[in-house]
Curated annotation (Swiss-Prot):
It is found in: Mitochondrion. This is Uncharacterized protein C7D4.13c. Keywords: Mitochondrion. It comes from the Eukaryota. It comes from Schizosaccharomyces pombe (strain 972 / ATCC 24843). One of its GO terms (cellular component) is mitochondrion.
């Protein structure tokens, strides 16, 4: 069971978020509840847009009622494989109280999603309660594969998060990825996907990034930080990839063809996805000021995979 807890104003953007997220198997087989009759129309609207009847979406008219609802729903949250708390335009004191309550009850399986105009603030400025935030506005497609976690680790510094990820890679529960590098979060939370599957999620989102309502500077920072995470996770360690360049392109190609990486790579992506990645690195790489060697290596890998080894 997955649990959504939201505020009274369910805007179209939030409905679209639900519409996209509910397509994930992650959220199937859940139920719909509202304790506030005045919000029944919003609940029905969510059902109408999504086509699903089974999402637990607790709606509160005031922030203190939301906090009260959390107290009352602790048993249900604990029994849920993953509880997703959707907080729309909630003030920081509410977030603080909710994280306090969850932590007090030892709940580590809850995903906390804050959806508001204030979300562009870097989460590490919220020093006590480290949360991941949704930049607002974004498209429903971009939000589709995002899963957020909260962490109570005090005073974690931004520059230390990569080492933390690596140290906790085999057991990444209750783990926070700093904004805006949020797309690996779902992979880490689920803890069941191989690195190539995480990469698949990342690059799929790269293809959607141009549709974001974001500035060029933010877009570049977003992509480059995700590329940095890829390298720090050492997904391409045996290809000798370093941030934004490759030590030896020839050596990388040789290792690619002599190891089982090709099979792993092909299994992780469909032909259409591979073609999309080819286009991404060919047409976006120059704009992102990636090195020529990195573009050539990815293009070589992707073209060979897409055209020589994919028949479907």
């Amino acid at each position: 069971m997955s649990l959504f807890i939201g505020t009274h104003n369910i805007k179209n953007s939030a409905i679209q978020l639900l519409k996209t997220k509910l397509k994930n198997e992650f959220l199937k087989g859940v139920k719909c509840i509202t304790k506030y009759p005045e919000n029944a129309h919003s609940i029905f609207k969510v059902q109408e847009y999504t086509g699903y009847k089974g999402v637990t979406f607790i709606v509160s008219t005031k922030w203190n009622l939301t906090v009260d609802s959390i107290h009352k729903l602790i048993p249900e949250i604990k029994s849920s494989p993953s509880a997703c708390l959707l907080l729309v335009n909630q003030p920081y004191p509410v977030i603080e109280k909710i994280t306090d309550i969850l932590t007090k009850h030892g709940i580590t399986n809850a995903n906390l999603l804050e959806f508001s105009k204030s979300s562009l603030l870097h989460p590490f400025k919220r020093n006590r309660h480290l949360l991941s935030f949704v930049p607002y506005p974004m498209t429903a497609e971009t939000l589709g594969d995002i899963s957020w976690s909260f962490s109570r680790r005090e005073n974690m510094k931004f520059e230390k998060d990569q080492q933390y990820i690596l140290s906790k890679f085999k057991s990444p529960r209750n783990l926070l990825i700093p904004y805006p590098s949020f797309l690996i979060q779902k992979f880490l939370d689920m803890a069941i996907l191989p690195p190539m599957a995480a990469l698949r999620i990342l690059f799929y989102q790269y293809s959607k990034a141009s549709t974001m309502s974001l500035t060029d500077d933010f877009y570049n920072k977003y992509v480059l930080e995700n590329l940095n995470i890829i390298n720090n996770l050492q997904i391409f360690l045996h290809l000798d990839l370093e941030p934004l360049h490759i030590k030896s392109l020839a050596k990388a190609r040789k290792r690619f063809y002599e190891t089982d990486l090709k099979t792993t790579f092909l299994n992780a992506f469909s032909r259409d996805e591979l073609l999309m990645l080819v286009n991404y690195f060919i047409f976006r790489g120059t704009e992102l000021k990636l090195s020529v060697s990195m573009n050539l290596a990815f293009r070589d890998i992707l073209l060979s995979s897409a055209y020589l080894n994919k028949t479907k």
